[in-house]
């Protein structure tokens, strides 16, 4: 037995060293990734001077004001308003990353665009808090429609990934409050508990929910998950449309803009993905014009 123990000692020691090296490597990787994430989050934010849009805060009684950016194309007539919601897995992202894109689609679609810099789900902030910020922002612009030359009957909510969830959740909450949303666009959106929330609503409210366009990325479980919501909407008589972009990656629409050039996290940014992104924007714009006419 003594000889056996001696033979095992070097093996155990080697295994211990391997585990120690792996543990150190893991810690270093986590620290590096955490540093990069923090650097990316800071790099997403623009100064008011750098912004193309107009930055201001939407006031709320008894609650923190909501941080928004506004994009208004030249128009003598009242126009639809699009609430454009960034992604980031609920814990990252910033409305400023949509700055170039929001300015572009405002001009190309002939619609006002509002990006909502909802609070991220960390440091005690819940995902529902962010949904409430979106809802309150919609209500503010609806109440001040004349001031911004927008049509309060042509409200659109558009979101990507986590912003796609906020789109679905805010649209349902507004319907519960008797506020009509004209259209919702869900781009590879997180589904979470949306189907359960929808099914719990009275039948009349379920049938009155806004028409929905689902933009799907390729080979993306998050995109595919959102189809569960599309199915129940369709079953309740809500107009839906699904557009899948073959070869596209999760995040391809918003990430293919200049704001992502300086970030470490830009997996879906490439010339090929950018072509798909611009096509998707054209598709969304044309779909909205058909819905809003």
Residue ranges of model-derived segments:
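Catalytic nucleophile-loop/oxyanion-hole region of alpha/beta-hydrolase
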Residues: 94-95, 101-102, 114-152, 275
